[in-house]
Each structure stands twice: as C-alpha cells, then as structure tokens.
C-alpha cells in the first residue's frame, strides 16, 4: 500500500501459552516464540533507550520554569529489534520494532563477591521479566505490576525512538504533529498520553499548554471493546509506586479536565466522576485517551454507535467531531490466498488475478451464481479442505469425522460473551433428541471448537472442560454415530486456523448483541465460503448489509432489545424451556462424567454476578431454530453453495487494505 508506517511492540520471549487439555482441563505451557523466529530480527543496541520505574519525583521552580527530577529509580534498558515486512507486489517495506528489556549492568559483581549469588542476578532477572511473556496473568498484584511495566516500557521506548528520529530529520519538535501520527491501538498503549507530555515538558522544555497542543494533535485512539474489564483501570497505589512522574502528569491532566467539566457541566458531579482520568482510587486508561486524542474510532458501525450512545457518550457530547467508525479488516491474502490456495487458484481461473491487489474484484464471482459446474467445483474444493481437517482431527484427537457432514465451526478465544456455552447446550439438546427418537433421520453434523481461555478465567476454563466432556459423551455413544460428532481442537493459533477456516461450512458468530466490538473470525470464515450463523452484533451487522438475510442465518435479540430486557428486569427462569432445563440438569447430575454446577449456576443464579449475564437462556430458542434452518438449507446443496459463493464475492469490503486506507486518510492524514 506504500504507506510509510512503523509498528512498535515488545520482543516477547514467550507467547500467551501452549494449550494442552489434560483430563478435560486446560493446562498452560510455555510457548517459546524466539526459538525459531529470532533469526529474522535485527538488533540495534546503539539505539537502546533508558526507561525509568519507581523512585521519587522532586519538583521545583527555576527562574519561572517548572522543573522535575526523578531519583532512586530502577533503570531498564530497552533495545530495539527490527523486523522488516514487505507488502504483496509492492516496493514498500515497513518496519516492526520490538523492544527487549534488560538492566544497564546485567551482573552485580559486588554481590557475587560477597557470596550473594542470587542477588547478583536478581535485578537483571526482574528487568528481563518485562519482555518475557505476552499477557501475564493479572489476577494478582504481581501480574498487574508486570503488565503495567510492560505497557510503560513499550510506550516510553517507542516515543523516545520516534522523537529521536524526528529530531534527526527536522531539529525541532514544533512540527511533530505535522510529520508524525502516533496511533494508540486499544488502551494498552494509553500511557502514550502522559509519556509524550513528560518528554516534551521534562526533556525538551516545552510549557504545558504547548506540549498538550502537540500531544493532542499527534495522538489518536482506537477502542476495541465495550467490555468493562478491558477498559483498563490501574490502582492509584500501584500506578504511583511504579510510575511516579507519569502519575503526577495524570493528576495535572485530571485537574485541568475537572476545571473544564465544572464549567461545562456546573451541577453534575456524577458526570465529572464518570469522565475523570483519576477517580475512585483508579487511573482510567480509556478516559486518558478520550481526554487527549484528536481522533477516536470504533471498529464496526454498531460498536461505534454503542460507544457514542453509551460508554463514551459524555465525551461524544462534549466534542463529537473527534469520533468516527473504521470497521476492522483482515489480511485476506493470508486468509484466502495462503490458507486456501485451491480456492484462490480456482477464483483466478474464473475472474482473473485482480482480486490479489483489490479485494473488491471478488464481486465478479457473482456472475457464476447460476453456473452449476462452478458450484460443483466450489463444493469439491470445500470437501478437499474438510478432508484435510478431518485428517488433522484423526491424528490429534483420535476422532474420525465425516467430511460429508456439516462442519459447524466456532473458533475464537473463550469468553462468556462469545457464548460457546450456547453452542454446547444446543449440542446436548440435539443429543437428547437423537437418543429419544433414534428412528428419526438426522443429517450428520460435526461441531468443531477451538479456543483458549485466559489462565485466570475460571468459568471460561470450566466451559472448555464442559465442551470436552460433551465430546467424550457424544463420540463414545454408538447410538449417535453417523449423526453427531463433537471435537475440541487444542492449542488454537494462526497455523491451526489456516487448516480449520477453509474447511468450515457454518461460521458461528453468536455473541450476545452489543458485546462484540467487531470480530474478525467472521470475516476470515466468510471469505472462505462459510455461511454465518449469528446475531446482529459487531461486524455481523455489516456482513448482513453486504450479503442480505437470505445468505446468512440470523437469530437472537438485537442490541437494543438486549438493553430493553435488562431495563425491564431479566429473569432467565422465565425463558427456561423443559428441553433446556433437562440439559442444565445434565450439567449438575454427573451425567457428563463430572459435575458442572458453576456453569449451570452462572446461568440461573447471581453467584457470578447477574444471572445469565450474556442472555444465553433468553436467546436459546431462537438459536435452536436457526441451527435447524441451517441444516435444512445445507441439504439443498445448490442453494447452500450459492450462499457460500455470495459470501466469498461480497467479502472484499472487509479487507485490511480498505481499513488501513481509511485510517491513513481519515486519521493519520497520510
């Protein structure tokens, strides 16, 4: 795309984790990212920068100028490692800079000489921990501390590098916002706001007002979630301990914000508190971005609407010119051309290779909607991919699945709002139907799950255990053989997704409406010809706009209906059918080989917050009807393949090329 951009992240030694299912329970093991990949990285030790943690901040006035000094801090050295990335058929090469952390002196010789061998290495070990593991568990204070240190290392080292490079070229920072756009991708790099202020004020002697003007004009922010727990908030005590100067800057940002809000909303302390950067002993990362950034966007139209009308409404009302939507996109050359070469190659014989550069050229496939030979060839390619996945499942799960069955696929991280539980409850309902009426013909169905749960997320891990228990029950029951199979494929990752996604017939996108910001698995599956079965949530709404109701299977309440039901007072017992009640009793009776009391309780009691927080029970009957409808349509092979073709042809809008172009024009001014 010929865009002059650089990405920044951390050079993690280990990924999130390798997942193993042991006795039905997710176990986490180290996933060494550098073992094979470090060869592609180019270290630049001469461009290392210092990042400071802890200590004390001293402030004073000197000749009318505000001055600060930080003492007693821990110094960490961040070393950049560059990965060069070329585009498809492009002259541009972009750079991804990854930072590793270490101490200025990796070895304390004095401690070693005293015989204190552990202390001789301790400080360096603590520094290196910053770049050790992606997303360390944060359900304890040490995990929170490490995550905060990771975020500040990324932000401080990256901004120092950006300013150093800018000064080499222009010898001034006055024009920073004219030449540089810094984009905050979700709240993890939100510390860009106070860190850029620190650099401008403390290191380059700008006054506060001019520094704030530059910072606001330089920074922009994409929000990726409406989930409260993902809108990061740091305890003041932890924040102040680790980042004392950054905390004092946040205090000043908050003080000035409060002065403004008290002028605009003079009698509304509730609004002041909700919009505050610091309140209730927390530092709020999203509000930090909302206070500062010149552009703020959501990642689907529904998501942006929800941000503007609810979560960020007060900031939107204060200045709506900063808000816009840019729907997510996918790297379709990976997810179609690389992952599904048979389909990509066949499309080139039909419509040429123009779609390799312009995804919208896929629309030319529409002309073949009535061509029975083309439809047959598309089915043959899909079956070939299903045979490949079936072979993987046989090898890794020891389960033989029928490639002529429907491959009903739900692949994404495990979270209650994504409602893998809704899917597995339906499977148990179907299992009971088959057991009750063995004489009734049932079209063969294979349900395929792959998901990782966060290491500290108990209920998500319980749901994985439930899926595994259901798969053991179903796959070992001779009465349902040839009709029903359930598979949980462990250790979901990109390379595994490249095998699963091209083989999918149905794409499960079943989050409760209003909770999924966008989703991208829906787009990856769509461009590979899977037909979406989903709610009107996230980018599903825009998929529906592209393909129409007739080319997907919709169910469930809308976001407005969900909100209205909560306001009326939602009681899941009012939606509980005898059929679903029977399934929930199976969870607590031991019929699955173990009890899942907590999973059942999460739906019917307030043990884990509101009963059925994600309205699984309320949407169950609608979901069941959509599943039945999908199976019925699938048996009309021509009709279903036409739906598949329509999804491929109309998926071009969801290319990351389009979304990046929007960012470049509408936010970065490239």
Predicted segments with their positions:
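A conserved ligand/cofactor-binding region detector
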Residues: 1-670
């Amino acid at each position: 795309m010929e865009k002059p951009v650089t990405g920044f992240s951390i050079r993690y030694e280990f990924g999130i984790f390798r997942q193993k299912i042991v006795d039905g329970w997710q176990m986490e093991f180290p996933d060494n990212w550098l073992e094979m990949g470090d060869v592609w990285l180019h270290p630049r030790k001469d461009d290392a920068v210092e990042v400071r943690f802890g200590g004390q901040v001293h402030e004073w006035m000197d000749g009318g100028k505000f001055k600060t000094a930080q003492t007693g801090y821990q110094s960490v050295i961040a070393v950049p490692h560059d990965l060069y990335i070329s585009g498809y058929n492009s002259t541009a090469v972009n750079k991804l800079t990854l930072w590793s952390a270490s101490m200025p002196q990796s070895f304390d010789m004095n401690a070693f000489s005293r015989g204190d061998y552990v202390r001789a290495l301790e400080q360096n070990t603590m520094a290196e921990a910053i770049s050790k593991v992606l997303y360390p568990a944060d359900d304890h204070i040490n995990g929170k501390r490490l995550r905060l240190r990771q975020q500040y290392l990324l932000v401080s080292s990256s901004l120092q590098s950006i300013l150093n490079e800018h000064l080499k070229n222009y010898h001034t920072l006055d024009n920073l916002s004219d030449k540089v756009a810094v984009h905050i991708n979700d709240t993890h790099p939100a510390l860009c706001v106070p860190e850029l202020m620190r650099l401008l004020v403390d290191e380059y002697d700008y006054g506060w007002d001019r520094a704030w003007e530059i910072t606001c004009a330089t920074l922009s922010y994409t929000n990726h979630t409406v989930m409260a727990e993902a809108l990061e908030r740091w305890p003041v005590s932890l924040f102040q301990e680790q980042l004392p100067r950054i905390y004092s800057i946040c205090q000043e940002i908050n003080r000035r914000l409060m002065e403004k809000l008290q002028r605009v909303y003079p009698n509304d302390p509730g609004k002041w508190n909700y919009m505050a950067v610091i309140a209730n002993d927390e530092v709020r990362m999203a509000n930090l971005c909302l206070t500062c950034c010149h552009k703020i966007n959501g990642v689907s139209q529904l998501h942006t609407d929800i941000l503007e009308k609810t979560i960020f409404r007060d900031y939107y009302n204060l200045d709506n010119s900063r808000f816009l939507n840019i729907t997510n996109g996918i790297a379709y050359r990976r997810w179609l051309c690389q992952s599904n070469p048979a389909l990509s190659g066949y499309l080139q014989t039909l419509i040429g290779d123009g779609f390799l550069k312009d995804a919208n050229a896929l629309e030319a496939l529409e002309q073949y909607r009535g061509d029975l030979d083309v439809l047959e060839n598309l089915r043959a390619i899909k079956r070939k991919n299903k045979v490949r996945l079936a072979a993987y499942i046989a090898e890794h799960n020891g389960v033989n699945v029928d490639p002529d069955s429907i491959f009903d696929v739900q692949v994404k991280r495990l979270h209650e709002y994504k409602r893998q539980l809704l899917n597995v409850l339906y499977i148990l309902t179907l299992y009971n139907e088959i057991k009750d009426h063995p004489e009734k013909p049932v079209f063969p169905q294979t349900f395929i799950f792959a998901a990782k749960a966060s290491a500290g997320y108990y209920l998500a891990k319980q749901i994985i255990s439930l899926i595994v228990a259901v798969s053991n029950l179903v796959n070992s029951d001779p009465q349902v053989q040839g009709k029903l199979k359930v598979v949980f494929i462990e250790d979901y990752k990109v390379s595994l997704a490249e095998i699963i996604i091209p083989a999918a017939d149905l794409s499960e996108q079943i989050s409760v409406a209003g909770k999924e910001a966008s989703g991208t698995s829906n787009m990856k599956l769509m461009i590979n010809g899977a037909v979406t079965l989903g709610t009107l949530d996230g980018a599903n709404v825009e998929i529906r706009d592209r393909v129409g109701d007739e080319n997907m299977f919709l169910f469930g309440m809308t976001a407005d209906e969900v909100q209205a039901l909560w306001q009326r007072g939602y009681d899941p017992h009012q939606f509980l059918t005898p059929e679903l009640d029977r399934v929930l009793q199976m969870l607590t009776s031991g019929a699955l080989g173990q009890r899942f009391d907590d999973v059942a309780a999460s739906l019917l009691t307030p043990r884990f917050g509101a009963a059925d927080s994600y309205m699984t029970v309320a949407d169950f009957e609608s979901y069941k009807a959509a599943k039945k409808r999908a199976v019925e349509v699938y048996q009309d092979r021509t009709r279903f393949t036409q739906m598949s073709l329509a999804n491929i042809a109309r998926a071009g809008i969801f290319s990351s090329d389009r979304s990046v172009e929007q960012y470049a024009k509408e936010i970065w001014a490239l």
